[in-house]
Structures are given as structure tokens and as C-alpha cells.
């Protein structure tokens, strides 16, 4: 009975209590964190974009880079082509001919973004000033450069990320559910950065940090953004998500695509967890508490949920048959909800939003469970194809 109570508490804690406490704290004012006065000094900036077959979005992104004001940023744009087979190379060369700030690095071997980080980390770490990592489809608006300049002056040692906002051309019903989850994640990371200056992970589409603070990135990494952000925290550097900088993240809304993405990310996060103790520095109590509350318990949710459901079969005999009834009721309820949602979509092309959200939650936790099994069994995921969910599907 005690074990059942502990399992139930952990699930309620990570999905209800912890977010509730953090969002409540986020609503409070923090007068001791007033904005510091800033100057207009020119700062060195290296912008790195890893590109694999992004011809459709690359021209707009590179055009936005040319608006970077020279009086604020002494900028250089490094575009690393990860074995692109489309016209991305020609797009970058065209910009390179018109603007000397562009540098093209072409790699024939397909390594993926983490692999390219590992290959070029020494060169990037040795540069002066700040390093801004952007996804190939992210567009920095003209006013964003001044905001970025102010933020790095106020937080010179921090890793600062833009907040994520999902968008998609897809009409799939699951886009809304994924957007709601991403919105909750964004608000939690905003709160963690605002209250503790320790946002658990950054959104990989847009973040900046001092070049010298780029950690040593190991080979065969699957998920790079969480590793880089946590390395900053362990080294005692702040991690912040800015409300003023918005990075639009493309999600497909297609169930199969999001399932594979969640599965791959979960496997990569468990791999990262084994590498974190080897990072230099010592994590504070607040950092470890946030890591456990926001990340690890989320990754353990499907295992905790299954254990809670089947625990009814192992209760003391004096509590039976209520324990069996509990287990069968939970299993039946999940099957009923998934079945009702499936039939609603097939027959009527719609289902209630609450039912849709619950079904999406269950299916995504199944993806997390598969990713956990992949990690335990030592399975390697293939290199992710970003174009699969960045273009119109």
C-alpha cells in the first residue's frame, strides 16, 4: 500500500504539483532582478547554422542574418552543410559572394547536428565573444538583434534561449495537443530561469552562450541542446529562457512523426544522463531538484504509471478483490478512451478535445517507454532528418 502511495505521489508531483508551484512562483514579482543599464558597445558574435537539405527555408533565414547591425555585433555567419544533396550549397554560395561575413563549411559525411558539433567544437570554442546557434528555419527579426545585445550584457555568462512557439502547415488533429504541451514546457522553463536562473534545457532552435563556455561535446551524442545547457548549469553558469525572443518550432502534428521524435529524444536524454556526471563542476541542490522534478520523473512516467496500474494485483489478500478491480478498471479506461478517440476520428473526423488530449498523452508516453527500452537495450537511432517535420507535410 505504501508503494502504491509513493507511485501515485510521484506522478501527481511531476505533472501537477511541480508545474503548479513553478507557475505560481513565476507570477510573483522579483524586484531584486531589475534590468541593468546597457551600452552600445560592439560585441563579437559567431552565428552557426547546421544545414541538411534546407533549401526551401534557407534563403529567408540567411536574408534575416544580413540585417544584423554592425554597430552592435561584429558578426560572422558560419553555415555548416551536413552532406546536403539539394540546392542549399548554391543558396549559401550566393550569399557568400555578396556578404563577406558568410563562411561556408561543407561536410561530405552525414553526421547530424550533434556529430557536427563534435567535429567543429574546437574551432567554435576558440572564437571570441558569443556563439549563437540557430536552426536553419529560424528568422531573427530586426528588433531581435538589439534585444539579444541587451540580454547578453545583462547576463554575460549565461546561456540564453528564445522561447519556443509551435507552428505547422499540417491539419492533423494532434498539432493542437503538441502545441499545448510545448506551451506548458515553455512556461515551465521561463519560470525556472526567472526564479532560479536554472532553466532545465533550452530550445535548440535558438540559443546563445559565450564561446569559451561551449562544453566538450562527446562523440555519438543523440540530443545536443540539453547536454550543452546542463553543462552550463553544472559549471555554475545561469540558464535563461527569454520571453522577448521567440523561436518558431515546426511540428508536424502527425502522430507517427511525433512518436518517432519523442522516442529518439527520450533515448538521447537517457544517454545524456550518463554523461552528465563526467562534466566539470558540481550541480547545486536547486539544479538537481529541477532536473529530477522536471526531467527524470517525466522520463519515468510510463514506468511509474504501469507499476501503479499493475500494483493492484499485488496488494495484500485482505484488500482483494479491490486491487484486481483497480488494475482492470485502469486498463479498461485507457483502452476505452483510445478506442473512442480512434472511432471518433474514423467515423466523424473529430473527437472531444479532452479525449484527444488524453489519447495523445498516453501515446506519447508509449513513445517515451520505447525510447527508454532503446536506451536499456543499447539501440542506436539513425541520424534524424529535420526536413521530415519542417516542411509542409
Regions picked out by a protein language model, each given a short descriptive name:
Residues 57-60, 86-95, 117, 143:
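Acidic helix N-cap motif at the loop->helix transition within catalytic regions
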Residues 106, 113-117, 128, 142-221, ...:
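Long helical/loop segments within the catalytic core of UDP-sugar-dependent glycosyltransferases
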Residues 63-74:
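Short, acidic, metal-binding catalytic loop of nucleotide-sugar glycosyltransferases
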Residues 81-90, 109-111, 138-139:
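A conserved acidic beta->alpha catalytic loop
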Residues 152, 156-184, 220-221, 228-294, ...:
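Catalytic donor/gating beta->alpha subdomain of glycosyltransferases that bind UDP-sugars
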Residues 1-39:
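N-terminal membrane-anchoring/stem segments of glycan-assembly enzymes
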Residues 28-29, 39, 298-380:
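Membrane-embedded multi-pass helical conduit in multi-pass membrane proteins
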Residues 131:
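Short aromatic/hydrophobic "clamp" motif used to bind/position activated sugar donors
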Amino acid at each position: 500500500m505504501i508503494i502504491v502511495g509513493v507511485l501515485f505521489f510521484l506522478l501527481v508531483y511531476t505533472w501537477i504539483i511541480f508545474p503548479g508551484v513553478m507557475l505560481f512562483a513565476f507570477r510573483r514579482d522579483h524586484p531584486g532582478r531589475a534590468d541593468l543599464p546597457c551600452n552600445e558597445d560592439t560585441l563579437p558574435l559567431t552565428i552557426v547554422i547546421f544545414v541538411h537539405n534546407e533549401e526551401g527555408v534557407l534563403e529567408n533565414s540567411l536574408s534575416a542574418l544580413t540585417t544584423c547591425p554592425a554597430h552592435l555585433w561584429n558578426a560572422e555567419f558560419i553555415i555548416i552543410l551536413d552532406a546536403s544533396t539539394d540546392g542549399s550549397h548554391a543558396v549559401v554560395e550566393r550569399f557568400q559572394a555578396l556578404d563577406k561575413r558568410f563562411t561556408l563549411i561543407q561536410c561530405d559525411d552525414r553526421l547530424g547536428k550533434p556529430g557536427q558539433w563534435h567535429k567543429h567544437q574546437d574551432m567554435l570554442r576558440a572564437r571570441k565573444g558569443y556563439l549563437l546557434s540557430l536552426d536553419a528555419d529560424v528568422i531573427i527579426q530586426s528588433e531581435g538583434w538589439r534585444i539579444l545585445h541587451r540580454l547578453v550584457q545583462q547576463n554575460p555568462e549565461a546561456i540564453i534561449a528564445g522561447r519556443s512557439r509551435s507552428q505547422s502547415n499540417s491539419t492533423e488533429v494532434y498539432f493542437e495537443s503538441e502545441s499545448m504541451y510545448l506551451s506548458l514546457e515553455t512556461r515551465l522553463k521561463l519560470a525556472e530561469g526567472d526564479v532560479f536562473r536554472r532553466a532545465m534545457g533550452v530550445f535548440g532552435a535558438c540559443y546563445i552562450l559565450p564561446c569559451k563556455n561551449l562544453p566538450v561535446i562527446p562523440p555519438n551524442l543523440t540530443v545536443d541542446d540539453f547536454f550543452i545547457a546542463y553543462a552550463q548549469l553544472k559549471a555554475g553558469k545561469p540558464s535563461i529562457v527569454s520571453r522577448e525572443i521567440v523561436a518558431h518550432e515546426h511540428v508536424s502534428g502527425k502522430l507517427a512523426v511525433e512518436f518517432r521524435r519523442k522516442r529518439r529524444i527520450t533515448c538521447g536524454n537517457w544517454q545524456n544522463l550518463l554523461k552528465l556526471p563526467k562534466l566539470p563542476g558540481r550541480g547545486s541542490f536547486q539544479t538537481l531538484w529541477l532536473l529530477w522534478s522536471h526531467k527524470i520523473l517525466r522520463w519515468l512516467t510510463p514506468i511509474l504509471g504501469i507499476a501503479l496500474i499493475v500494483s493492484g494485483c499485488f496488494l495484500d489478500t485482505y484488500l482483494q478483490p479491490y486491487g484486481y478491480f483497480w488494475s482492470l478498471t485502469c486498463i479498461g479506461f485507457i483502452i476505452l478512451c483510445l478506442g473512442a478517440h480512434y472511432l471518433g476520428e474514423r467515423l466523424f473526423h473529430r473527437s472531444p478535445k479532452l479525449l484527444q488530449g488524453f489519447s495523445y498523452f498516453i501515446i506519447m508516453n508509449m513513445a517515451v517507454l520505447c525510447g527508454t527500452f532503446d536506451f536499456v537495450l543499447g539501440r542506436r537511432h539513425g541520424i534524424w532528418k529535420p526536413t521530415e517535420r519542417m516542411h509542409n507535410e
